[in-house]
Amino acid sequence: ATCAGQDKPCKETCDCCGERGECVCGLSYEGKYRCICRQGTFLIAWYKLASCKK
């Protein structure tokens, strides 16, 4: 999946602020699709991921 405004497609797996999860495209509060982290049905907000230092 590729999110609008993203240079790269969402990865299948990623480090979600230290928690393992699946990166998926999701609708943010801005009304834009962003890469977000999903762990089962639990979503970690994209802005929290963006604030994580890689």
From Swiss-Prot:
The keyword Transmembrane helix does not apply. Keywords: Disulfide bond, Ion channel impairing toxin, Knottin, Neurotoxin, Secreted, Toxin, Voltage-gated sodium channel impairing toxin. Disulfide bonds join 3-17, 10-23, 14-52, 16-37, 25-35. It is found in: Secreted. Pfam families: D_CNTX. GO terms for cellular component: extracellular region. The keyword Mitochondrion does not apply. Belongs to the neurotoxin 03 (Tx2) family. 04 subfamily. Blocks voltage-gated sodium channels (Nav). Causes immediate spastic paralysis and death in mice within 1 minute of injection at dose levels of 1.5 ug per mouse. This is U7-ctenitoxin-Pk1a.
